[in-house]
């Protein structure tokens, strides 16, 4: 919708406002990998591109003179989930990579090193032809997310593959 330059500038303006007004415990941006996975990426590719996008924000904010410890805690992530085995650890792997990079490359404090993430179960895993099994698919994906210690979770409705979800 927007050019990359405009989007980064807009997000930078929002983040500068958050810092100036001391807005805490509210996420200025949710760095999303959900759409990447729903477009066909496997879990490893989703993670790689999402973290890359996150580091793009970090580098841009730093280039505008913001302090890593001022904006780091305001970043969150949004991942898709599926039944591939890698989904059982996507959050743990993301947290480890993020924390190490934030500490070792950027000198971030503990709070800024924390990766907070939301999981939504995969819409593309739901089938119109086997709709009765969609609840099972979603349940397995939700269990992966819970066992991986996600911060928040959205589960899709069983009929999301064929219509606007009912419940």
Please give the residue ranges for each predicted region.
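Catalytic alpha/beta active-site cores
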Residues: 1-81, 86-87, 105, 112-118, ...
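Short glycine/threonine-rich loop-to-helix capping motif typified by GTGT followed
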Residues: 39-48, 82-93, 121-135, 163-167
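Conduit-forming functional cores of very large proteins
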Residues: 48, 99-100
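Amphipathic alpha-helical scaffolding segments
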Residues: 74, 96-97
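Conserved, mostly hydrophobic/aromatic
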Residues: 98, 148
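Short, acidic/polar
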Residues: 135-142
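Active-site or pore-adjacent capping/gating segments
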Residues: 140, 151-167
């Amino acid at each position: 919708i927007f050019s990359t330059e405009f989007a980064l500038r807009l997000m930078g303006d929002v983040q500068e406002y958050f810092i100036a007004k001391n807005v805490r415990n509210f996420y200025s941006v949710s760095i999303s990998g959900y759409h990447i996975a729903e477009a066909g990426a496997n879990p490893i590719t989703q993670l790689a591109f999402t973290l890359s996008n996150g580091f793009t924000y970090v580098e841009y904010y730093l280039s505008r003179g913001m302090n890593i410890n001022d904006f780091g805690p305001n970043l969150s992530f949004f991942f898709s989930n599926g039944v591939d085995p890698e989904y059982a650890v996507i959050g743990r792997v993301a947290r480890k990579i993020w924390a190490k990079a934030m500490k070792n490359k950027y000198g971030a404090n503990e709070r800024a090193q924390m990766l907070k993430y939301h999981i939504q179960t995969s819409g593309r895993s739901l089938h119109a032809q086997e709709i009765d099994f969609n609840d099972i698919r979603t349940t397995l994906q939700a269990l992966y997310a819970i066992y991986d210690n996600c911060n928040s979770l959205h589960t899709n409705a069983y009929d999301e593959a064929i219509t606007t979800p009912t419940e």
